Regions:
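Cytosolic regulatory modules rich in charged/polar residues
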Residues: 1-97
Length: 97
């Protein structure tokens, strides 16, 4: 299975899914100034977020998404856990008087 719900809003994804596929499944938008990442593989994209070879449990945040390396083999990312965090626009509601 390449996209597995783990509960608590977290999903384990294969590193060979594209960023666009994962963002679609998570109902997230890729920022307009970063559209070139849409066709990158998740593993390649995640690697670029680190300034070192990542280890399991290393994580980074990207525009409302927390990403954790969950499985590696010989410096290759195999699985990632994606956890969408609250989007700012979702917390604004209810102000109408």
């Amino acid at each position: 299975e390449s996209f597995v719900p783990l509960g608590g809003g977290r999903y384990e994804v294969d590193a060979d899914l594209t960023v666009g596929e994962v963002f679609d499944k998570l109902d997230l938008e890729i920022p307009d100034d970063d559209e070139n990442i849409e066709h990158k593989l998740m593993g390649e994209w995640a690697y670029e977020q680190f300034d070192h070879i990542p280890s399991e449990r290393d994580q980074f945040a990207y525009d409302g998404l927390e990403v954790t390396v969950s499985k590696m083999r010989q410096h290759r990312i195999l699985k990632l856990v994606c956890h969408p965090t609250a989007k700012p626009e979702e917390t604004k509601g209810g102000d109408e008087a």
